[in-house]
């Protein structure tokens, strides 16, 4: 997971996307990273390849979404680049669709 996160962060920076590690003392299961570009904020959970978010992480993602936030998760570099390209080039509709589709898949 750490190697994938490092690669994603390097890629985001190469696109001029601001990123920070997200921690919230007293709150578990928050997404790993915050990415910001063009006034759009994206929370992203980064998983080990083949792994999915825990129920607690899915719950936290649902809370973020319920207040209008954009949040998703990835377990590979290809999916991460799709999220980041959408963020960088303000493809907001695509970004929202990606986030919404993931959440629908997880609730099925």
Please give the residue ranges for each predicted region.
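Catalytic phosphate/metal-binding cores of nucleic-acid and nucleotide-processing enzymes, i.e., regions
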Residues: 1-108
């Amino acid at each position: 997971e750490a190697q994938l996160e490092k690669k994603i962060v390097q890629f985001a920076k190469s696109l001029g996307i601001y990123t920070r590690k997200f921690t919230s003392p007293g709150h578990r299961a928050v997404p790993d990273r915050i990415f910001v570009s063009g006034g759009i904020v994206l929370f992203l959970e980064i998983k080990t390849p083949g792994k999915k978010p825990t129920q607690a992480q899915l719950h936290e993602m649902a809370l973020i979404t319920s207040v209008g936030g954009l949040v998703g998760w990835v377990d590979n570099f290809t999916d991460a680049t799709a999220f980041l390209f959408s963020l960088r080039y303000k493809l907001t509709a695509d970004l929202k669709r990606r986030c919404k589709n993931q959440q629908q898949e997880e609730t099925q």
